[in-house]
């Protein structure tokens, strides 16, 4: 595809070349006169070649009016804007939007009355989220501090009460506790805070124990504070350190992070100074071995200090340590452009050697002494850290710092038994320790097969009985089967069978072979294992039996081969719906089974709650299209309850839109009206169940296109492609209206209000849709104002609805809606006047209007609060009370 795009760009360039040179037949003198202009044009062509191919296609689409309109017709641009962004919480806004920082920057710079940042909690979430140390983040914090400080020159009155410089201590404390070096550094520079002030904050607000449980972030901020001389003497990283070595020294860490962690740790303390202090306090006895280890550590630190990060390639730095040691990452020198993959020895070449080699243009004369073995470097890092902890932790805590199994696997050549003794038995190993040990040993390609056989035999013979408990056998079984090594599995099964033959059946210790194979079939990751079971253990297990349910466990990548093996002996798979809807892959399996009725038998007898959770869980996993495919082809025994469609509060409510469009594609407002009329007739007898009964809809669907090849489809007897099917579902009136709202069918909602006011405006339907708890979560300022205008124009029975909408507008801070009401020439401003005996044209009493203002104060939108206080005819005492509330929050 890339080549095709490049060809197209070259063709475009060639076309331009021909256009520029179309006067080649002119006289030579004319050519010379045009030569500067030709050169200028050719220079433009060269810059054009630097454009990414995808950008060419973007502009082709962007300039095509028809395609452009079609794409942007899916965006509700007039409905959503800054006025609909309320607060910047960490989950839904900061991490839920890829451009959240840009939105905040734009909102601040726009001097808009509607500020997204509403309170200190929003700022704390920002500090917790944006920590990257780059120019963009630094500029962002400078802008933030400038905007929210007492010296701000913004012409707009801030709706928020935040003033960074009015409580310097509190914000320093928050930035340290959120380990945000970037924000703290910019904060100190912006407000020109001296080191003594920071020390004072540390002494009062940050306990020395804060650095006791050390993470990478805490090491980073500790060293930063130390570098600017802002650490009080009471705050020492050591001996309070209690680092989680399992995380800190994990071989799954990226190499570059591991190097940084090492440097942060070593830089955080002066070993010699600490040793001298401990000697003075009599805490450290000078023993020859201690001195030897201390000298060894210093020597390793010196050696590692000579190694520069620039000597490693980007591939190496971005790889995990485990991958580097397993030789699965391409490695290359830091200067040469060629990359070579190694399988025996990982090396880097010193920059000095590279420099000399490049100057001499001779890559064959590299001094072998200048080559550094990467494995040795990694080993030095680990040994240095282990020695470091030996000298810095309290004696009573030294027992928790043990070397991990992977350290012995990669850096020490020891027997399996000896490694078990070191990393498991010595520490009275937990189930997790056993799990890690067995899986690592059995999957390690560098350990001889005979040693693995011996391990299996020792476990089955209870050689590890000291720490190996009965239920730990299942951990071992899983480790064997997850190895996906046919030789190991075969050896294990034969030994199990042999042990069972020598035992009394009633007290057999281990499960049957057939049960073991089925219990762990979800671990099979290659066809050869399936073939092995099929050829050798087919009669001893249920894996390939007729109507077996093991298809639920087989990995999707292998399911086709499993179907082939099962079908080759005339058997079918069975897929029961009950209890399996929570499996992440169940919907994919279900769709596959529906399309292959000759291979699967399916029972759709699950309850409505089963189907609800199936849809719920898969919407959360971005599988809207799979759900649609399922609904298009499934044969339900009863209408499906889809009340989940009305979910407005779930974090994935927006993902439901695709499904809602699919279901309501051919359901007109007239058909909805007919259904509601039937519901309305049922309400006359005031029966609760009937009044709140669900509405049943029928939508027309087309069976999904089969994903299998035509030949395979013919073999398994797939459903007819393109066949029209009917699908019945039920929803409540509330959910119906929420769905119409989400589909931008607000006109249809108003149509239904007009046609069936008795349905929506009766007291027992007062909780439907327009209640504050429901409309609050989904309404934009644009549509909320539409509803307000509609209720104003139809005041017969809509006063309650109108009031709820005004409360929502106030709480969300939609200032413009109230400005429009106040400036309206349609005499709607009376809505914001107090109803009295002499003024019956108003709708709301003093308490109701007071509550509207209270909501704006609670949301910290003081501009709106002051607007309403000044306009509503409160008493002088009432105005003063509301203004005092504002002052208390400022």
From Swiss-Prot:
Residues 1-39 are annotated as: Disordered. Residues 1-35 have a biased composition (Basic and acidic residues). InterPro entries: UPF0746_actin_org. Belongs to the UPF0746 family. This is UPF0746 protein DDB_G0280811.
């Amino acid at each position: 595809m890339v080549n095709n795009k490049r060809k197209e760009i070259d063709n475009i360039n060639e076309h331009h070349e021909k256009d520029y040179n179309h006067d080649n037949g002119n006289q030579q003198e004319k050519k010379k006169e045009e030569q500067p202009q030709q050169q200028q044009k050719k220079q433009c062509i060269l810059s054009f070649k630097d454009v990414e191919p995808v950008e060419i296609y973007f502009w082709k689409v962007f300039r095509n009016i028809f395609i452009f309109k079609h794409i942007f017709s899916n965006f509700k641009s007039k409905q959503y804007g800054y006025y609909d962004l309320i607060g910047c919480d960490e989950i839904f806004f900061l991490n839920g939007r890829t451009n959240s920082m840009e939105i905040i920057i734009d909102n601040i710079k726009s001097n808009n009355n509607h500020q997204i940042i509403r309170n200190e909690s929003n700022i704390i979430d920002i500090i917790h989220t944006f920590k990257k140390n780059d120019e963009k983040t630094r500029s962002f914090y400078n802008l933030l501090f400038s905007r929210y400080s007492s010296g701000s020159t913004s012409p707009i009155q801030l709706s928020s009460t935040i003033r960074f410089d009015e409580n310097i201590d509190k914000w320093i404390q928050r930035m340290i506790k959120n380990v945000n070096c970037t924000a703290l550094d910019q904060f100190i520079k912006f407000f020109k805070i001296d080191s003594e002030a920071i020390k004072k904050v540390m002494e009062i607000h940050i306990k020395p124990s804060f650095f006791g449980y050390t993470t990478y972030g805490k090491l980073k901020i500790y060293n930063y504070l130390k570098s600017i001389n802002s650490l009080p003497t009471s705050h020492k990283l050591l001996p309070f350190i209690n680092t989680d070595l399992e995380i800190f020294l994990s071989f799954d860490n990226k190499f570059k992070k591991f190097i940084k962690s090492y440097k942060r740790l070593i830089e955080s303390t002066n070993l010699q100074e600490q040793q001298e202090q401990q000697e003075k306090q009599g805490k450290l006895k000078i023993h020859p071995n201690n001195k030897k280890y201390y000298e060894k550590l210093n020597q390793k630190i010196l050696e590692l200090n000579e190694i520069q990060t620039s000597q490693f390639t980007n591939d190496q730095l971005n790889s995990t340590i485990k991958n580097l040691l397993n030789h699965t990452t391409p490695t290359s020198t830091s200067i040469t452009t060629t990359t070579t993959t190694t399988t025996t020895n990982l090396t880097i070449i010193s920059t000095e050697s590279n420099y000399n080699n490049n100057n001499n243009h001779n890559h064959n004369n590299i001094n072998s002494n200048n080559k550094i073995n990467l494995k040795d470097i990694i080993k030095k890092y680990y040994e240095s850290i282990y020695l470091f902890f030996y000298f810095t932790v309290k004696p009573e805590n030294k027992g928790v710092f043990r070397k991990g199994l992977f350290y012995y696997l990669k850096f020490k050549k020891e027997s399996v038994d000896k490694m078990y003794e070191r990393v498991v038995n010595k520490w009275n190993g937990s189930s997790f320790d056993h799990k890690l040990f067995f899986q690592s040993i059995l999957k390690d390609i560098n350990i001889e097969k005979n040693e693995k056989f011996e391990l299996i035999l020792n476990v089955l013979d209870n050689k590890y009985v000291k720490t190996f408990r009965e239920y730990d056998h299942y951990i071992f079984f899983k480790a064997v089967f997850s190895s996906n090594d046919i030789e190991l599995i075969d050896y294990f099964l034969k030994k199990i069978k042999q042990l069972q033959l020598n035992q009394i059946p009633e007290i057999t210790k281990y499960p049957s072979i057939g049960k073991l194979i089925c219990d762990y079939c979800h671990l099979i990751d290659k066809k050869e294992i399936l073939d092995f079971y099929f050829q050798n253990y087919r009669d001893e297990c249920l894996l390939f039996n007729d109507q077996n349910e093991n298809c639920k466990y087989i990995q999707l990548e292998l399911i086709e081969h499993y179907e082939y093996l099962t079908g080759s002996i005339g058997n079918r798979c069975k897929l029961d719906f009950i209890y399996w809807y929570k499996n992440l892959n169940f919907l994919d399996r279900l769709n596959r089974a529906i399309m292959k009725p000759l291979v699967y038998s399916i029972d759709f007898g699950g309850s409505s709650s089963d189907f609800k959770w199936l849809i719920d869980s898969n919407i959360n996993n971005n599988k809207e299209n799979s759900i649609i495919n399922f609904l298009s082809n499934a044969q339900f025994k009863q209408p499906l309850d889809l009340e989940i469609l009305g979910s407005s509060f779930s974090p994935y409510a927006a993902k439901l839109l695709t499904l809602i469009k699919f279901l309501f594609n051919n359901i007109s407002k007239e058909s909805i009206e007919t259904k509601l009329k039937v519901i309305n007739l049922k309400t006359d007898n005031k029966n609760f169940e009937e009044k709140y009964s669900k509405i049943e809809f029928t939508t027309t669907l087309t069976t999904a296109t089969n994903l299998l090849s035509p030949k395979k489809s013919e073999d398994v007897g797939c459903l007819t492609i393109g066949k029209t099917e009917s699908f019945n579902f039920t929803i409540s009136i509330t959910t119906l209206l929420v769905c119409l709202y989400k589909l931008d069918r607000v006109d249809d909602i108003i149509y239904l209000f007009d046609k069936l006011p008795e349905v929506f405006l009766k007291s027992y339907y007062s909780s439907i849709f327009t209640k504050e708890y429901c409309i609050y979560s989904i309404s934009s300022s644009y549509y909320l104002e539409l509803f307000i205008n509609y209720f104003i124009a139809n005041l017969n029975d809509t006063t309650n609805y109108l009031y709820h909408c005004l409360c929502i507008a106030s709480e969300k801070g939609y200032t413009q809606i109230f400005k429009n009401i106040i400036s309206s020439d349609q005499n709607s401003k009376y809505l914001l006047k107090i109803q009295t005996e002499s003024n019956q044209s108003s709708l709301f009493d003093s308490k109701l209007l007071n509550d509207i203002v209270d909501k704006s104060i609670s949301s910290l939108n003081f501009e709106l609060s002051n607007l309403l206080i000044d306009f509503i005819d409160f008493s002088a005492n009432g105005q003063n009370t509301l203004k005092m509330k504002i002052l208390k929050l400022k």
